[in-house]
Amino acid sequence: MLLHAAGDQHAWASFVGAGSLPTYNPFDPPARPEGTVTELVDAAVAAATAAWDQVDPASGSVPTPLPPVPTLPAEVAAAACALDAAIHAWDVAVATGQPSPLSDELAAALDPAARAVVEPLRGFAYAAPLATEATDGAAAALLRYLGRDPEWAA
């Protein structure tokens, strides 16, 4: 999962104009990173940060690494990139028995990007949505929309 998530961030960085594509397919990553996990994550965060630092949020559309959604308004694209990172952070956290890093506030901020990109990717990058529950906060509702069970634990 970490190699996939890091590869996604490198892909976003490359498409918005800074950085290079990962040397592997993020959807078929190698079993282990070339360096440490910390080096892998640090490099992905640095690449994404450097790329987005060069993008003016009011600049119009930017290219994306999402074939069904080849361009998005810059603000939506940045949020879609952040959505990818945040959801994979949730995946890793819950799979390793750690608390969710996805707050209701962050989920609410990322929800518009999810609504802009998820449906064309449904079945490939996202599972079918799960039914929401009356007690769901923004984080649980977003996870269910993305096909993830917010109650899942390792």
Short names for language-model regions:
Residues 2-18:
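Alpha-helical bundle segments that constitute or directly flank the non-heme di-iron/ferroxidase center
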Residues 14-26, 39, 43, 47-50, ...:
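Structured surface interface patches that mediate subunit assembly and partner/cofactor docking
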Residues 29:
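Short helix/strand-bridging catalytic loops that position acidic/His residues to coordinate divalent metals
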